[in-house]
Design a protein with these regions (language model features):
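Class I SAM-dependent methyltransferase SAM/SAH-binding core
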Residues: 81-123
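A short acidic, Gly/Pro-enriched loop at the edge of an enzyme's catalytic core
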Residues: 122-134
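Conserved class I S-adenosyl-L-methionine
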Residues: 10, 16-80
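A short glycine-rich, Lys/Arg-flanked "PGG" loop and its adjoining helix->strand segment in the class I
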Residues: 149-161
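Core SAM-dependent methyltransferase catalytic element
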Residues: 211-227
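Conserved beta-strand signature within the Rossmann-like core of class I S-adenosyl-L-methionine
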Residues: 162-169
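Acceptor-substrate binding/catalytic loop of class I
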Residues: 175-191
Length: 227
């Protein structure tokens, strides 16, 4: 029987499903159930700890890659408590949030004043060719590797022609598994590039964060992809 991860456990496996069996239906569902329960339980402390994080580099990267003068319709995919959602709205864009954690959805609606959809990343229901940009900041790494190709195709489909996906994820050596009560996948650039291009995206560029530090002190891989 599948067991939830302990808060002090670290269990990682290679993401190559050719050599590693896929997760069963129950195991797959639990990657969301347990991860979302963690965020719901710690929503307030998460908000206090991330509210002042400066990710303006990431927001600007997306906005500067969009064609036309705007305003743009932007999906904040994994919006959390709504920090970036509010910034996009304050800049005059039509920003819509999406998160699977109910506490985050409530916080984001209250803080940003934006429409926020409560959707599990594994059970998305997105409109076709609706958004100019998708801002996936620190969110897609929670999608198990066997489901990520499908989720990336769904994000491709919800973008208008020429739309742009921004993603930023903690990078690694192509492994996935439990870190405490959160499930995550940690890719290098080559593997992430392969996944995104197979979903139909064209790479616009990438960079590592935080800026101005040696590469071994830059744990985040950010990249931009055009439909």
């Amino acid at each position: 029987m599948f067991k939830s991860a302990r808060a002090d456990s670290f269990q990682f496996h290679d993401v190559d499903t050719v050599t590693r069996p896929k997760l069963g239906d129950q195991e797959l569902a639990q990657t969301s159930v347990i991860t979302l329960a963690h965020y719901d339980q710690h929503a307030d402390s998460f908000w206090r700890g991330t509210r002042d994080h400066d990710v303006s580099q990431n927001r600007n990267a997306l906005l500067n890659s969009l064609a036309g003068p705007g305003p743009f319709r932007i999906l904040d995919f994994g919006c959390g408590p709504g920090r970036d959602l509010k910034v996009f709205r304050d800049l005059g864009h039509e920003a819509i949030g999406l998160d699977g954690a109910e506490r985050f959805v409530g916080l984001a609606r209250a803080y940003s004043g934006c429409e926020v959809w409560c959707q599990d990343f594994l059970k998305l229901d997105l409109p076709t060719e609706y958004f100019d940009g998708v801002f996936a900041n620190a969110s897609l790494f929670h999608v198990p590797s066997q489901e990520l190709p499908r989720v990336l195709r769904e994000l491709w489909a919800t973008l208008k022609p020429g739309g742009v996906l921004f993603s930023s994820n903690p990078r690694g050596e192509n492994q996935e598994g439990w870190s405490g009560e959160r499930y995550g996948c940690y890719y290098d650039l080559a593997r992430w590039r392969e996944l995104a291009t197979r979903a139909g995206f064209v790479e616009l560029g990438h960079y590592y964060r935080p800026p101005g530090l040696p590469r071994d002190q830059q744990p985040w891989l950010a990249s931009l992809w055009r439909k």
